[in-house]
Amino acid sequence: MPDPSDRKAVTRYLEQTHDKIFESNRAWVASKKGADPEFFNKLAAGQSPEYLYIGCSDSRVPANEIMGLDAGEVFVHRNIANVVPTIDLSSMSVINYAVGHLKVKHIVVCGHYNCGGVQAALTPTDLGILNPWLRNIRDVYRLHEKELDAIEDDGERFNRLVELNVIESCRSVIKTAVVQQSYEENGFPIVHGWVFNLKDGLLKDLNIDFPGILADIQKIYNLTKGSS
């Protein structure tokens, strides 16, 4: 990035970085057509992804790439720190569409170590408009305060909060009516909690006990059609 005081250089830089995307797009199209001439015809015909991926907006964690999947194979929702508030219209709309219309078989909540959103939530300071969003993660800390405070190493505590934030987001997904009702009727979707490691590119499966969590949640949040 040029010196901001050199406006002409900044303008040229912005034009170049913008135009580069279209060059890359044309190269990508050529590559896809070369491998499969019908790729875009099939893409335009519709989507039937097996997976709903709920992840962090961090640019280093591209959902399709880390899962080894192509366009049309995963439905994606991303936000800061992969939080799933049940009052967030965006998250709830995505889950309802993915489960109710696309009939996804798996819902993955994927966090990542060294998450800036989780790190910010660990900082006891006023972060303005981010405060209500980060409150969700701070509440995760509050719920698991005893476990987290017992971890002496700051890095290990940070990593564990990343994992617990994923687990609590999975709980939020499981609380939704559309997930409970679809699972009762069809046996899917299954909810999974993963963490991506930026240092080696590997995914860690937290192996959440989906049936156990569902049974525990339904003691209070039983939203299946036969529960009334």
Swiss-Prot record:
The UniProt entry's coiled-coil ranges are: none
**Enzyme category, top tier:** lyase
Please give the family membership noted in the entry. Answer: Belongs to the beta-class carbonic anhydrase family.
GO function terms (MF aspect) = carbonate dehydratase activity; zinc ion binding
Please give the catalytic activity noted in the UniProt record: hydrogencarbonate + H(+) = CO2 + H2O
Q: Which InterPro entries match?
A: Carbonic_anhydrase, Carbonic_anhydrase_CS, Carbonic_anhydrase_sf
Pfam families, per this entry? Pro_CA
Protein name as catalogued: Carbonic anhydrase
Q: Any idea which UniProt keywords this protein has?
A: Lyase, Metal-binding, Stress response, Zinc
Q: What is the lineage of its organism?
A: Eukaryota, Fungi, Dikarya, Ascomycota, Pezizomycotina
The protein's Enzyme Commission number: 4.2.1.1
Q: Which GO terms describe its biological process?
A: carbon utilization; cellular response to carbon dioxide; cellular response to oxidative stress
Q: Which domain of life is it from?
A: Eukaryota
Q: Which cofactor does it need?
A: Zn(2+)
Which residues take part in binding Zn(2+)? C56, D58, H112, C115
State what this protein does.
Catalyzes the reversible hydration of CO(2) to H(2)CO(3). The main role may be to provide inorganic carbon for the bicarbonate-dependent carboxylation reactions catalyzed by pyruvate carboxylase, acetyl-CoA carboxylase and carbamoyl-phosphate synthetase. Involved in osmoadaptation.
Manner of cofactor binding, per the entry note: Binds 1 zinc ion per subunit.
For this record, an example GO cellular component is: cytoplasm
What factors induce this protein?
Down-regulated when grown with elevated levels of potassium chloride.
